[in-house]
Amino acid sequence: MIQTQSMLDVADNSGARRVMCIKVLGGSHRRYAGIGDIIKVTVKEAIPRGKVKKGQVMTAVVVRTRHGVRRADGSIIRFDGNAAVLLNTKQEPIGTRIFGPVTRELRTEKFMKIVSLAPEVL
């Protein structure tokens, strides 16, 4: 469950290391975002010579949460940390690599590129 002011790790090689959620998109007063939801983030920590700089406002999709995701069979998949992948204006990933596992819930038409780049799909 990601909300405003939540800090997330970045699971791609876009150049950002840590981002902070500044808005949960999809609804006028939506409070929480889960896996597969799109959020607005600001870059809090970035590596030198990366594609993004500190202070930039970007869109991102949540790929891992500590809260986890519940499956239809009753199982819950939880992760050790919260992570997101940065997107461009066309909702495509900025980075060319994805680090760490992602869940099967991202297998929609919008995020097939992220699923194909991920080393492991749970």
UniProtKB/Swiss-Prot annotation:
- What is the designated name of this protein? Large ribosomal subunit protein uL14
* Example of a GO MF term: structural constituent of ribosome
Specify the domain of life of the species encoding this protein: Bacteria
Name the NCBIfam families for this protein: rplN_bact
Q: Which organism is it from?
A: Pseudomonas putida (strain W619)
Under PANTHER family, the record lists: 50S/60S RIBOSOMAL PROTEIN L14/L23, LARGE RIBOSOMAL SUBUNIT PROTEIN UL14M
InterPro entries to which the protein is assigned, alphabetical: Ribosomal_uL14, Ribosomal_uL14_bac-type, Ribosomal_uL14_CS, Ribosomal_uL14_sf
The family classification in the record reads: Belongs to the universal ribosomal protein uL14 family.
* Described purpose of this protein according to its UniProt entry: Binds to 23S rRNA. Forms part of two intersubunit bridges in the 70S ribosome.
